[in-house]
Amino acid sequence: RLALAQLPAATEIGRNARQALHLAERTRDDGGAFGLVPLLEHRIVDHVYSYGIAAAETVPVALALAVAAGGSPAGAVPAAACLSRVADSAPALTGALTGALRGPAAVPESWRQACRTLSGCALPWLAGTDLVELAGRLVPGDGGTPGG
């Protein structure tokens, strides 16, 4: 609900966010985040205008899926990937929101390990870079969070 205060009601993103959260609350006990996917697909995601990364769709979808999954990254992120028009942006934003809500321990260990070390695909000189170690060097005094 705090997010809605930042989204003006008279804007596309504000209207979509309010509708998406209403859908999430209405269908909370009806399949969780995955049960919400068809509703978001048809009521929030625009299938005419072909700019699927628009914030007016991605932000509401991420908010609604986070609510429907009870803040669980494992419940919300895969559902976000099922919305084809926003699949390039919604999973990342949904993961960021649920991670911020629940903390790093809520992210499944298998996900953390799969994403921890860079393969160097786009930037070969970064192959083998451990992102947790790098984060520990960037945040003074933290020293890295084990398993984070």
Residue ranges and their predicted role:
Residues 1-84:
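Accessory "access/gating" subregions that flank catalytic or transport cores
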Residues 54-144:
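Catalytic phosphate/nucleotide-handling subdomain of diverse soluble enzymes
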